[in-house]
Amino acid sequence: LLYSRFWYKFLYDLGVVPTKEPYMRRTSHGMILGENGEKMSKSRGNVVNPDEMVDTYGADAFRTYELFIGAFDQSTPWSTQGLSGCNKFLDRVYNLKDMVTDSPDYSPELESLMHKTIKKVGDDIEKIKFNTAVAALMSLVNEFYKKGSVTRGEYKTLLILLNPFAPHITEELFEMMNFGGTLSASSWPAYDEAKTIDQTVEMAVMIGGRVRAKIMVPADMAEEDIK
């Protein structure tokens, strides 16, 4: 990685490039270790063949797991079970197509969560926090299943947000749902900042130093009014 800067400095001295530094910030990825937590090597017998993983679970599941496995810049042990989990997650995304309603809008009960998820996934991608972006999408899918349905608007947004991590299945689903055009050429969904802010918060009711109940109150309610 240091060579990128070394060669750039050399080119700068020759007057080929306009600036002294090649980049404002450099991020290097961590190492994927064997399942035993040690560095992968043939002598240790803990090498994972990516071709075999793709043949078994598919390229999308493999790609999603690689980005979900941990923080981008941290070394993390491999887990075939974790890859299987990402494969099941994509299966759930695929099966959602049978639960889609005709509404082009977000459902009232999930509107706030949709805007929060759009904001989080976009911000996390820019900050190279891919693992937490995928986690947010997993949570969103869980909410769709809890509700028992997903609107066309919600499903379209989900596919666009998931596309950077699982491009093949999302593009296929986008076409199957007749959303129009290609997913890769679609605009990133916008969010309303006001709708990312919780309107109510949960507060514990304590009696005698012990929590006796929990109530929901407006987020902007004054402390005296709550009392």
Q: At which residue positions do the language-model features occur?
A:
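Alpha-helical recognition segments enriched in aromatics with Gly/Pro capping
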Residues: 1-72
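Generic "edge-of-domain/loop-turn" microfeature
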Residues: 33, 210-212, 222
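Glycine-rich, small/acidic residue-mixed loop/short-helix segments
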Residues: 217-227
